[in-house]
Amino acid sequence: MPVITLPDGSQRSFDKPVSVYEVAASIGPGLAKATLGGRVNGQRVDAHDLISEDANLVIFTPKDDDGLEIIRHSCAHLLGHAIKQLYPDVKMAIGPTIDNGFYYDVDLEHKLTDEDIAALEARMLELAKTEYDVVKKKVSWQEAHAVFAARGESYKLEILERDIPQSDQPGLYHHEEYIDMCRGPHVPNMRFCLNFKLMRVSGAYWRGDSNNKMLQRIYGTAFADAKQLKAYLNLLEEAAKRDHRKLAKKFDLFHLQDEAPGMVFWHPKGWTLWQQIEQYMRAKQNDWGYQEVRTPLIMDRVLWEKSGHWENYRENMFTTESEKRDFAVKPMNCPGHVQIFNHGLRSHKDLPLRLAEFGSCHRNEASGALHGIMRVRGFVQDDAHIFCTEDQVVAEVAAFNQMLKSVYDDFGFTDIAVKLSLRPEKYAGSLETWNKAEEGLRTALRAAGLEWEELPGEGAFYGPKIEYQIKDALGRSWQCGTIQLDYVLPERLDAEYVADDNVRKRPVMLHRAILGSFERFLGILIEHYEGSFPVWLSPVQVVVANITDSQAEYVKRVEKALREQGIRVIADLRNEKIGFKIREHTIQRVPYLLVVGDKEVENQSLAVRTRDGKDLGVMPLDAFIAHLTADIARRGRVFSAE
């Protein structure tokens, strides 16, 4: 009879097969009441699934990430239950969980409106409040097929016929009269599904194939309690205020238009912001021993076939033909960098060789996936590749970690989550090489003082990788940086060097980026700072404004002096009231406003205000330049206006 081992190492013995719920009840009634499901020997199960042999058990409650996912998945079923009551002819497709929520794809002739969604949400709540039990039944493939055939659920039948072997026993979840098919697990009772919100409706092709019918995708979110739901909705409201597309219009940074989908038209202020970042990264890479290169935008398919991109990535590549030759616009820079490495015989004395490029790449993303400058078709990466020996990998990754931390600090991102993706089931190279590489990455992370989470099986087939996620002002995580070991591309493209024993060997190739896509990183910065960029990044750092025409010449002299110091400055000599000028430039989030009246002209001084409304008093030009220079040097760190 089963002996159940709990996460704290304690064990409980039972004289017959026992469910997760019953194990929880043996510990205490409070835990039993909160039990949603569990993990038995690594397998997720429902609360009432029986355990018939010795097992390790983790019990899921609403406090767990796994428990929250169960709640969200069950809310998708609740949505199915409700929409079937309101629209009996609807055909149900799929309803998975996603980040922060769930969706359900439905085939319904009636186009759902905001009013329909509100009514659907109300019916869902009405059903959940009845606190009915969710009953799971494992049935034969044939029985499941008969159930959905009788109900006219063509999409469920297709899933059965195409995706599920007839030897399987599908799980059917009964929500009173509504039946759905799922691997589960799901909540045992709908009292867990009271805190949800339907968010929006969009179109989605069945199976993501544009040749199939367009379905209606209903998105929702759900949480364990009302407080968490309210906090999340407030976060979304704040995120909407910070939407980089809205802020770009407000601050005149860039625009997008239908004639160039997924491509950005950068305006002067936005391009100034871009240039500050590029110049900063160029200097940083130079300090860390990188050599900047430039590779062609378009290259023959022969190279892409050798690299493997033509076979594995062709659908995402823009292609063209010229003089009976096929070409592709590069989706990434790595094959071009290998060509530079291969140009001439390399010695072990040349390694490590660090090649960097602000490479312009293009990927044929689906139009529905495009999102402002966060997801585009044309983008630039702070891409670099390090060619080194196996013995140099640890030192190179350790140095990269230090460089990455300093860059993120300068941009104001100090909360970094690190993920180490390890060997997948299918991999290239030897097990010994992989073990050495993985341990090398761990050593490099320790050397940088970074904590990390390990993701077994998540590495690419050609090598393990580290991903770096930064957290913004709203607590959202963004994956930007990465470093990837690659043992395969040097082999495919015949990269080699002469080792110290005069034997030709393959270099290890490290793919690395810190910002990732410039466009996406700029979008993150815009939303993170809500347009109030650190002074060193601000497109306009200072505005000098006169009160009357009599101060115009002095304002021009101040502007000239600041410009000569490399400061991005504008003189506002418009015939407007000073209060109007102050408000306008404050709204535009210009860091410093220098107000000049007759007294300032007489004393050769400046009245200094910040965009936050702080009055820094009157000071000479030299004193202000010293103050501003110190502020710029702080970069993304907290600034004290003293």
UniProtKB/Swiss-Prot annotation:
It is found in: Cytoplasm. It is an enzyme of class 6 (ligase). One of its GO terms (cellular component) is cytosol. Residues 1-61 form the TGS domain. Residues 243-534 are annotated as: Catalytic. GO terms for biological process: threonyl-tRNA aminoacylation. Binds 1 zinc ion per subunit. SUPFAM superfamilies: Class II aaRS ABD-related (SSF52954), Class II aaRS and biotin synthetases (SSF55681), TGS-like (SSF81271), ThrRS/AlaRS common domain (SSF55186). Catalyzes the attachment of threonine to tRNA(Thr) in a two-step reaction: L-threonine is first activated by ATP to form Thr-AMP and then transferred to the acceptor end of tRNA(Thr). Also edits incorrectly charged L-seryl-tRNA(Thr). This is Threonine--tRNA ligase. Zn(2+) binds at C334, H385, H511. Keywords: Aminoacyl-tRNA synthetase, ATP-binding, Cytoplasm, Ligase, Metal-binding, Nucleotide-binding, Protein biosynthesis, RNA-binding, tRNA-binding, Zinc. CDD domains: TGS_ThrRS, ThrRS_anticodon, ThrRS_core. Homodimer. The keyword Cell membrane does not apply. Its EC number is 6.1.1.3. Belongs to the class-II aminoacyl-tRNA synthetase family. It catalyses: tRNA(Thr) + L-threonine + ATP = L-threonyl-tRNA(Thr) + AMP + diphosphate + H(+).
